[in-house]
Amino acid sequence: MIGLPHYLVVAAILFTIGVFGIFVNRKNVIVILMSIELILLAVNINLVAFSAYLHDVAGQIFAMFVLTVAAAEAAVGLAILVTFFRNRGDIAVDDASMMKG
């Protein structure tokens, strides 16, 4: 049977991959956004796993809110990225400091 430690190990692996992706690929904005999504997925797995382990629904409800915020963050981030690519022709992180506003 799959227990709480299995979920925690999977979440820890996903969190580590996400942090590793941010530190290794600092130049590519798309990889940074995907790594942030992996980190949020690991947090959601922890929330749902502990919620099921403790027989409490609050963690699962909070995970739904985190998923909603993550979807909005991804949509806004990709919209800014598309606009930035149309204006500059490149999506390097170094050029982000040249944005107006």
UniProtKB/Swiss-Prot annotation:
EC number(s) stated in the UniProt entry for this protein: 7.1.1.-
Mode of membrane association: Multi-pass membrane protein
Protein's cellular compartments: Cell inner membrane
EC category: translocase
Pfam families: Oxidored_q2
GO MF term list: NADH:ubiquinone reductase (non-electrogenic) activity; quinone binding
Subunit structure: NDH-1 is composed of 14 different subunits. Subunits NuoA, H, J, K, L, M, N constitute the membrane sector of the complex.
UniProt similarity note: Belongs to the complex I subunit 4L family.
Protein name per UniProt: NADH-quinone oxidoreductase subunit K
Gene: nuoK
